[in-house]
Amino acid sequence: MLHHVELWVPDLHRALASLGWLLEVLGYALFQSWEGGRSWRLGPIYLVIEQSPALTADEHDRCRPGLNHLAFHVEDATTLEKLVADAAQHGWHLMFPERHPYAGGTQHYAAYLENDDGFEVELVAINSPERK
């Protein structure tokens, strides 16, 4: 079982506005807080967002080796669409809008969002209609 994920970000305040907002609306609770970062916990798993002084670059590129994206379950299509609608006010942009919500295939109801720092999340509806 996954224990935790730690994301190093170039700007903590931007990350808190986008990733922090998303984690909280997905049910994660603030777990730890320090000058350079925060963590959120859901059950035994926690996610860390940190602006480390040891960063060697000032931007994230999901197409480089390393983390491409994080994927989260949401309850259903209605919840997913509400999150997509609200996400723009929190620094997120819908990817593949011309294929939304089936960019991952006709049996995969999901939204792909990218924040201003280039981090991608995939929101996957657990209960959703299949595209016909």
Regions found by a protein language model. Give the residues of each.
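Short glycine-enriched loop/turn motifs at secondary-structure junctions
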Residues: 1, 63-66, 105
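Vicinal oxygen chelate
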Residues: 9-15, 71-117
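Long, continuous compositionally biased terminal/linker segments
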Residues: 42-75, 79-82
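Short beta->alpha transition motifs characteristic of CBS
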Residues: 104-106, 123-130
